[in-house]
Design a protein with these regions (language model features):
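Generic recognition of long tandem-repeat/solenoid scaffolds
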Residues: 75-86, 205-209
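Domain-wide signal for the mature, well-folded portions of proteins, strongly enriched
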Residues: 85-87, 130, 137-139, 148
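Short, surface-exposed interaction patches in beta-rich subdomains
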Residues: 138-233
Length: 233
C-alpha cells in the first residue's frame, strides 16, 4: 500500500505532453486558433519565445495526434492547433489542455479562437485581446488591455487585479461577471435590447459602478444580459 501511495504522489498530473517553442524578436500580432479543448491557460511574461504546451491525462502520442503549427508572417504570428481525425471532439474537450506563454514585450494585438470549458488569462498586456468562440468560464487576472469577449454562450467571468476594458459582446445570452468588493469600474450598456444588472449578496441592487474609471465593463450585442456581481470581502 505504501508503495502504491508513493507512486501516486510522484505521478505527474499530466502524463502526456507536447511542447512547441518559437523565438520572436519584434512586436507581433498573434492570431491563435486552438479549436476545441478542455482548458486553455494563457500567460504573458518575460523572455522572447512563444511556448505552446499540450497536456493530457489520457491521450498518448500527443505530438503525432495533435499538431501545432506556428507561422511567422511579417509582423504576425499564426498559431494553429489541429487534431487528428482519429481523436473525437468529445475526447479533446474532456482530456486536452493547452498552456500558452507569450513574450510580454513583443505582444501586439491578440486574437484567440477556441471552444473550451475554461479559459485563464494571466498578465495580458496588449492594445487589444479578442476572444472568438464558446467558453463557459473565464478568469482574467492581472494585466492591462482591452479585452473583447465575442461569445454567444452563457459565461461566468471572474476579474481580479485587471486594468483596462472588458467588452462582453453576445447575442441572446446571459452572462455573469464577478469583481472584488473594492474593484472600481465604469459600466456601459450598448446594443439592442441589452440588460445590465448589478448583484450583491445574492440580491439585485442599484448600480454600484462609478462615473469615471480606467476600468470599463461594457455589454453589447442583441438581446443579451450581463449581471455584474460584487463579491464579499
Amino acid at each position: 500500500v505504501d508503495e502504491l501511495l508513493s507512486e501516486e504522489a510522484v505521478r505527474p498530473r499530466y502524463p502526456y505532453e507536447s511542447i512547441v517553442e518559437y523565438d520572436i524578436d519584434e512586436i507581433k500580432h498573434f492570431d491563435i486558433k486552438l479549436g476545441s479543448v478542455n482548458h486553455v491557460k494563457m500567460r504573458a511574461g518575460e523572455g522572447e519565445k512563444i511556448k505552446v504546451q499540450l497536456v493530457s491525462d489520457t491521450i498518448e502520442n500527443l505530438t503525432e495526434l495533435v499538431k501545432v503549427k506556428i507561422d511567422d508572417i511579417k509582423r504576425r504570428i499564426d498559431v494553429d492547433v489541429n487534431r487528428s481525425k482519429s481523436l473525437s471532439e468529445e475526447l479533446v474537450k474532456e482530456h486536452l489542455w493547452i498552456f500558452i506563454n507569450l513574450p510580454e514585450k513583443y505582444m501586439g494585438d491578440t486574437e484567440l479562437a477556441t471552444h473550451c470549458e475554461k479559459l485563464e488569462l494571466f498578465d495580458i498586456i496588449s492594445e487589444k485581446f479578442e476572444l472568438d468562440g464558446a467558453v463557459k468560464e473565464i478568469h482574467i487576472a492581472g494585466g492591462n488591455s482591452h479585452i473583447e469577449l465575442d461569445n454567444n454562450s452563457p459565461m461566468e467571468i471572474y476579474v481580479a487585479d485587471y486594468t483596462g476594458r472588458i467588452d462582453v459582446n453576445q447575442i441572446s445570452a446571459k452572462s455573469r461577471l464577478y469583481v472584488s468588493h473594492e474593484y472600481a469600474f465604469k459600466a456601459v450598456k450598448k446594443g439592442v435590447r441589452t440588460k445590465l444588472l448589478f448583484e450583491e449578496h445574492g440580491n439585485l441592487v442599484d448600480d454600484f459602478s462609478v462615473a469615471e474609471s480606467e476600468n470599463h465593463i461594457e455589454i453589447n450585442g442583441i438581446n443579451s444580459e450581463l449581471t455584474i456581481v460584487k463579491l464579499s470581502n
